[in-house]
A protein has these predicted regions:
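A residue-level marker of the well-folded mature domains of exported/periplasmic proteins
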Residues: 21-352
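C-terminal motif of bacterial Sec signal peptides marking the signal peptidase cleavage site
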Residues: 16-20
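Positively charged n-region of N-terminal signal peptides that target proteins for export
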Residues: 1-11
């Protein structure tokens, strides 16, 4: 029986469905990084045996049954898997299901029939789940925000969310709020997350929320399916209702890219600062580099997630590791990208 490794991207995407960047579908819940044990990228590398150099020279066949390659995000994910295999001299087959669950199951069966050593599937019994360090990254983004406002200035924001009830989106939204609260009030991370959870309950229940201690308000929320086009529509509506805001919090940069068009059209480029919990697309990094009102983006790199999944697959195939050797979730390193560091992350040749 072949070992199957499930791979998931935090925020949007977990075992059942990759939806965030190309389909207008409600994203399913994903594992909550606060509720499961996790390895970091470095810990996984430390667990790799000293014989790995010899192991990498062996021929391994990796198969990736991907939900879709219909967007640059998915393309970059597949490319990350392919490049990681190529670096090791391994064979790699990517089969695209075009968002068809039946076809995806058929693709997995095809890969097993082709005797690949490790089929990577997004909806299988898992060795482990690999994704971006969602909560830590969003919290880091939030802590970075207050420096751009005077100590006694009200941070008056709206928020763009991907999908109702999406666990990853909730983690990102609450993470940014928790970071702001922690930085402005000097609270511990645990205390700030507790405050952020209560704040988020008010936001979901009432459509707006205010935190007196942090002098932070979110005056409106729009669900924009992780898409720039919906971010444009959502921001247009939010600006009509809330013309005096000075801040935009977005759960990903694609929605913020659409929102930026609405901000510019409304003549509010110099009024509203933009902060994104993720993802780090090429277009987002260009805004961060060239637009002084874009301040920070949390990194959610599909190539890095793909590469880490291949690394773990190699440990399973070549070293005989099992689910018992990994935590339930293995996460990539948490990074935030700012205007000072964006050139270290921006890749003009990136497919994403």
């Amino acid at each position: 029986m072949k070992k199957i490794l499930a791979m998931a991207l935090a925020l949007l995407f977990v075992a059942a469905l990759f939806t965030g960047c190309s389909k207008k579908a409600e994203s399913p819940s994903e594992p909550n990084a606060n509720d499961v044990a996790s390895d970091t990228t470095e810990e996984v590398k430390e667990k790799t045996s000293a014989d790995n150099t010899d192991a990498d020279s062996q021929t391994v066949k990796i198969g990736f049954a991907i939900k879709s390659t219909g967007s640059s995000f998915y393309q970059a994910l597949a490319t990350g898997v392919q490049n990681a295999c190529e670096e090791r001299g391994w064979e790699c087959t990517v089969l695209n299901a075009d968002m068809d669950i039946t076809k995806e199951q058929e693709n997995v069966e095809t890969l097993i029939g082709q005797q690949v050593d490790a089929p990577i599937d997004a909806s299988a019994e898992v060795i482990t789940t690999v994704y971006n360090n969602n909560t830590t990254t969003a919290f880091m983004v939030g802590k970075y925000i207050p420096q751009f406002f005077a100590d006694d200035e009200l941070i008056s924001s709206v928020v763009l969310s991907g999908g109702k009830g999406n666990t990853g989106g909730t983690e990102r939204r609450q993470g940014m709020v928790a970071g702001i609260i922690a930085e402005r009030m000097g609270l511990s991370e645990e205390e700030a997350w507790s405050e952020a959870a209560k704040f988020d309950e008010d936001l979901i229940a009432n459509g707006h929320a205010f935190h007196e201690g942090a002098n932070l308000e979110i005056r409106g929320q729009a669900y924009c399916n992780w898409l720039a086009s919906d971010g444009l529509d959502g921001m247009e509506d939010l600006l009509v209702a809330n013309p005096d805001i000075n801040c935009l919090l977005s759960e990903n940069d694609d929605m913020a890219l659409g929102a930026q068009k609405a901000i510019t059209a409304a003549g509010k480029d110099n009024q509203i600062q933009v902060f994104c919990a993720a993802d780090g697309s090429k277009e987002g990094y260009l805004q961060l580099r060239d637009n002084p009102q874009w301040r920070v983006i949390g990194e959610n790199s599909p190539p890095k997630v793909g590469a880490l999944a291949v690394e773990i697959a190699g440990q399973v195939v070549l070293e005989g590791k099992t689910a018992n050797d990994f935590d339930a979730v293995v996460m990539t390193e948490a990074n935030i990208v700012t205007s000072d560091t964006v050139n270290d992350f921006y890749d003009p040749d990136s497919p994403f």
